[in-house]
């Protein structure tokens, strides 16, 4: 987690990952972010929507983010993305950035996709980005869960969860995906 809280990671998120992922994406006025970590992605996402709910599993990270963003349009919630505590069809868009590889096994990732489909309104967009498998990343995550998603598997997995119009593209840092809920 140390690197994910670093200035180097913040710069990469702000200058490359989110500009690449969010180009042409509209999240609507009530968006959901899963796995914000220290909130570098949240800082940008909060400017793209009227209200942002950020769901973080780690209580310490959630508390720090909630304190830092108190009084803004961001609500930070401690929660598990495989079992979201929200009513169906609540959110107008959803985002996840470099978090899905921390979920194992693949069936748990698929539960996240299904939960996102459940809490999104019809026609809403999910935008996600993550890295692809590499030996370097495997070593970096040796004391952590590391279960990267093969970008070739995203389309069928997201469609099985209820998404359509799935678009996956790869770039230097991994993959970016947008999917519209049918």
List each model region and its residues:
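Conserved alpha-helix/loop element of class I SAM-dependent methyltransferases that forms part
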Residues: 10-29
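C-terminal alpha-helical "lid/dimerization" subdomain adjacent to the S-adenosyl-L-methionine
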Residues: 4, 9-10, 125-178
